[in-house]
Curated annotation (Swiss-Prot):
Keyword terms: Cytochrome c-type biogenesis, Membrane, Thylakoid, Transmembrane, Transmembrane helix
Pfam family, one: Cytochrom_C_asm
Predominant subcellular localization, coarse grouping: membrane
Name listed for the protein in its UniProt record: Cytochrome c biogenesis protein CcsA
Organism field: Picosynechococcus sp. (strain ATCC 27264 / PCC 7002 / PR-6)
Entry's transmembrane regions: 15-35, 36-56, 71-91, 97-117, 142-162, 246-266, 273-293, 307-327
Length: 338
């Protein structure tokens, strides 16, 4: 069997299937009354996931090492991870919104790897001595899976912001005083009927220090906000919850990956941490999502505030993963490819 030809077939097939899958999810969102579109989208993601897993397996057999040594291999591993996390998130949420926002990202990753990278960057090559270690599989694979989980979790947070139009809403289980308000609909009104939301000020202590009272609302703070339908409120609650869970999965993987990388660096170069650009941005990524989880667990944040933090984390992950490669600097660089 010609493994090189098989890989070329599988990378183009993965791109085509994900492109069609993206259209199916978008069609299902635009025309929810058409049955089966979302189910076909899920099937497409599963097929693409299998194609990419087979591609990586074929590359492993051809090259004789775990396929994470160059940008082409890592991009397809990332796309495989994104589709895997997509299937997990969709199974947990039962929502077509997951595919609407994750399928384009997975498709874009495969398009970049299969159609944009030059042929010399797609071909396998002998490993440099520093990469001939079991740490290649242990460190890099965990980091890539953590990137995939954090990207999908962040995308679901972005979907939450789109669904709620950036409004503050009170989610199920949110604590009193966390700054969120459910936009309630008055009876006998349609979804388009505006409702008036009163933004009350925070409680302020009396001068005797023993009693807290609710300050009077400022009439200038009265705002007219379009109501969200019960379906949109339920969807927003689901997206917020699943985003939190997926990020909660990705963060410990990122932590383990960073620690494994530090041990490998000490073994290969005699230093646990050298402030390489990739190391620096991995630390920044860790701090962003640590702040997200701290805000959710300790401060009780839900809804819009942590969603903005996760959305920022989406871009930080991309800088951490591709920024070093674009710069062409550091020990982790695959080289300048423009």
């Amino acid at each position: 069997m010609d493994l090189v030809a098989l890989q070329s077939l599988l990378d183009n097939t993965s791109f085509l299937v994900l492109f069609l899958t993206m259209l199916l999810y978008w069609g299902g969102a635009a025309f929810p009354n058409i049955p089966g579109l979302t189910g076909l989208g899920t099937l497409g993601v599963a097929i693409a996931n299998l194609c990419m897993a087979t591609l990586l397996g074929a590359r492993w057999l051809e090259a004789g090492y775990f396929p994470l040594s160059n940008l082409y291999e890592s991009l397809f591993f990332l796309a495989w991870g994104v589709t895997t996390m997509h299937l997990v998130a969709e199974w947990m949420s039962r929502s077509r919104w997951v595919g609407v926002i994750t399928a384009p990202v997975a498709m874009g990753i495969t398009a970049f790897a299969a159609l944009s990278l030059p042929a010399e960057m797609q071909n396998s090559a002998p490993l440099v001595p520093a990469l001939k270690s079991n740490w290649l599989m242990m460190h890099v694979s965990v980091m890539m899976i953590s990137y995939a989980a954090l990207l999908v979790g962040s995308l679901l947070a972005i979907a939450f912001l789109i669904v709620t139009k950036g409004q503050k809403i009170e989610l199920r289980g949110s604590s009193v005083g966390n700054g969120s308000y459910r936009l309630r609909q008055p009876q006998n009104t349609t979804d388009e009927t505006p409702v008036t939301v009163v933004a009350f000020q925070k409680t302020e202590p009396q001068s005797n220090g023993n009693t807290a009272v609710l300050a009077s609302p400022d009439l200038q703070q009265l705002t007219t906000t379009p109501a969200l339908s019960p379906q949109m409120l339920s969807l927003a609650d689901t997206l917020d919850n699943i985003s939190y869970r997926i990020i909660g999965l990705g963060f410990p993987l990122l932590t383990i990956g960073i620690i494994a990388g530090a041990v490998w660096a000490n073994e290969a170069w005699g230093s646990y941490w050298s402030w390489d650009p990739k190391e620096t941005w991995a630390l920044i990524t860790w701090l962003v999502f640590a702040a997200y989880l701290h805000a959710r667990i300790t401060r009780g944040w839900q809804g819009r505030q942590p969603a903005f933090l996760a959305a920022a984390g989406f871009f930080v992950v991309w800088v951490c993963y591709l920024g070093v490669n674009i710069l062409g600097k550091g020990l982790h660089s695959y080289g300048w490819f423009f």
